[in-house]
A protein has these predicted regions:
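Structured alpha/beta or helical-core interaction and ligand-binding surfaces enriched in interleaved
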Residues: 1-180
Length: 180
């Protein structure tokens, strides 16, 4: 798979077009809800995002690893939440002005998009690093035409895969076993 570095999304209009494109061409997306400690509540901004996105939730779990990020901080809580890529999510995903605003405390962290279980847009907002993973030159050209500035980074990039169906089946089994 080819990796492309996203080095600029010129303005809010381009950002909004990018979000629309990603929602239309992805199966699901993820964000990270951060808390300083297990006993810390989510802040008001994160609660609002979570409430608005609740109808589109697929799965959520605490994690230490997500696309292009791994944390060793054992005290903080990172909860990855996966949502259907539905155009009804457009308004909440375009509340921020730029991809690098997907960062605590004003928004959930690290918005990522997935296709066929693979992350094809990975964001590490606090490091201002964003990558697209695709072998489809047409997708890259369409994004460039929207004003997304990308450059080829490498061939044979390692991809983050999330088997959402497996996780959802595991979750269903866990709930059924609790009821027995």
């Amino acid at each position: 798979m080819k990796e492309y570095f996203v080095y600029e999304i010129k303005n809010k209009e381009v950002y909004d077009d990018f979000i629309q494109y990603m929602l239309e061409h992805s199966d699901f997306f993820s964000v990270i809800y951060f808390r300083n400690r297990k006993d810390s509540p989510l802040n008001k901004y994160l609660k609002e995002y979570k409430k608005i996105l609740r109808p589109y939730i697929l799965h959520a779990e605490n994690t230490r690893k997500w696309p292009n990020t791994e944390t060793w901080n054992g005290r903080s809580v990172y909860r990855i939440a996966f949502y259907y890529a539905d155009m009804k999510c457009y308004d909440v995903l375009t509340r921020v002005n730029d991809i690098f605003e997907w960062h605590y405390p004003r928004a959930p962290m690290d918005l990522c998009f997935y296709k066929n279980g693979y992350c094809w847009f990975a964001l590490t907002a606090h490091e201002e690093m964003a990558y697209l993973y695709t072998n489809n030159e047409k997708e890259i050209q369409e994004l460039r035409e929207l004003g997304v500035m990308v450059e080829f980074s490498e061939d044979n990039a390692r991809l983050f895969h999330y088997d959402l169906e497996k996780e959802m089946n595991h979750y269903r089994t866990k709930i059924l076993n609790k009821k027995l």
